[in-house]
């Protein structure tokens, strides 16, 4: 549904926001009642784009507006529950030899290993969102492996792999994406954009 709402051919003005922005908006609105101006600032979108985004969510009956601001409807809460069921730990990741930016953010996507091809799709999505790049790991037989070769993390980086596993606590066939950027915001948005590729 979120992908359809973000498509340019949807009814109404051509949106200048993405499926990722819609997902983030639902997460934000699900955590607090929020007004348009504050939501605009949180999303990093202009006032016009935020107004259109809110209109699309209203038309889809995913949110409603009260005196306290935007809040999720039952349908909106259902979508948020689906997102939470697919996404696991989200965390700032320390700079290391495997990271690709001064700031790094990781996210776990549950049970999505079979959707990973080469990892390039995730990297490209992260870059389009403003990150420098992204590194993707999948969990196979209890170990972190790196596509496309599915080879184990090099021995010299085993301590890093161990720290990642302790931080994200992945299960078999989970995916961990770590995006790096020139700011925490770009790193987080890159990781989320890469994760969305696996949920489309």
Segments (PLM) and residue ranges:
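Basic, amphipathic "hinge/linker" alpha-helix immediately C-terminal to the N-terminal HTH DNA-binding motif
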Residues: 68-81
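Short amphipathic alpha-helical interface segments
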Residues: 19-34
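Mid-protein regulatory/catalytic core that forms ligand/cofactor-binding pockets
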Residues: 98-198
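A short, conserved structural fragment
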Residues: 58-68
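A short acidic, leucine-rich amphipathic alpha-helix
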Residues: 38-43
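Short alpha-helical segments that sit at the start of domains
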Residues: 1-23
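Long, charged amphipathic helices and adjacent flexible linkers at domain junctions
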Residues: 87-101
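Short amphipathic alpha-helical interaction segments
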Residues: 44-58
């Amino acid at each position: 549904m979120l992908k359809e709402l973000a498509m340019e051919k949807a009814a109404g003005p051509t949106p200048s926001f993405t499926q990722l922005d819609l997902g983030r908006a639902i997460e934000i609105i699900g955590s607090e009642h929020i007004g348009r101006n504050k939501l605009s600032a949180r999303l990093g979108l202009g006032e016009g784009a935020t107004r259109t985004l809110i209109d699309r969510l209203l038309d889809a009956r995913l949110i409603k507006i009260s005196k306290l601001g935007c809040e999720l409807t039952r349908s909106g809460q259902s979508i948020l529950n689906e997102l939470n069921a697919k996404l696991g730990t989200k965390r700032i990741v320390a700079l290391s030899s495997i990271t690709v930016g001064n700031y790094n953010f990781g996210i776990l996507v549950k049970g999505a290993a079979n959707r990973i091809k080469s990892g390039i799709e995730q990297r490209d999505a992260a870059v389009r969102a403003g990150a420098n790049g992204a590194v993707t790991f999948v969990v196979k037989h209890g170990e972190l492996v790196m596509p496309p070769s599915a080879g184990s993390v090099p021995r010299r980086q085993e301590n890093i792999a161990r720290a990642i596993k302790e931080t994200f606590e992945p299960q078999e066939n989970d995916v961990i994406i770590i995006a790096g950027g020139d700011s925490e915001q770009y790193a987080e948005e890159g990781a989320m954009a890469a994760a969305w590729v696996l949920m489309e």
